[in-house]
A protein has these predicted regions:
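N-terminal leader segment of winged-helix/HTH proteins
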Residues: 1-38
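Short, locally clustered residues in the helix-turn-helix/winged-helix DNA-binding domain
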Residues: 20, 24, 49-55, 115, ...
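N-terminal positioning helix adjacent to the helix-turn-helix/winged-helix DNA-binding module
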Residues: 15, 43-44, 106, 133
């Protein structure tokens, strides 16, 4: 009985290591493609993605919460995106210190270009996984992340 438990435990540890290795590989691949093909970064892509999903804009604190990073990290990225004309700062009435960040039309078009290629790269990487298998993997991984939501 103990050997089965030990074996199951070791299989789960190896599974976790494989998930981690795969995630790191995909992230590195995406970072390189964005840098080489578009001279941009994955964090900038992530910020633009969050803003694309919020057409009325987001406060820095909201953006930090969505991306799970510090306000300081977000502020530097937003500053550069504003300089490039991809993001605009919108004043919040009644709060002189806070503002919303929103994609400009130029930024939205640029993000759509990035997103189209991003999806293509992911599809290339995962091409050996059927749609049904991808759904099953997603379900299994969701069962793990839902445990974190209980806290």
């Amino acid at each position: 009985m103990i050997s089965t438990i030990e074996t199951d435990s070791k299989v789960r540890v190896r599974t976790w290591l494989k998930i981690l290795k795969t995630s790191n590989f995909i992230e590195k691949y995406l970072r390189e493609r964005l840098r080489n093909d578009h001279r941009t970064t994955l964090p900038r892509f992530d910020v633009m993605s969050a803003l694309q999903r919020s057409p009325n804009g987001l406060k820095m604190s909201e953006l930090s919460g969505v991306l799970k990073v510090s306000n300081g990290n977000i502020t530097g990225i937003i500053d550069r995106l504003v300089q490039e004309g991809h993001v605009e700062r919108i004043a919040i009435q009644g709060d002189r210190r806070a503002y919303l960040a929103a994609l400009t039309d130029k930024g939205s078009k640029k993000f759509q270009e990035y997103a189209l290629e991003h999806e293509m790269w992911i599809n290339e990487l995962l091409s050996d996984i059927s749609s049904d298998d991808a759904k099953m993997i997603t379900s299994l991984l969701s069962s793990i992340t839902e445990k974190g939501d209980l806290k």
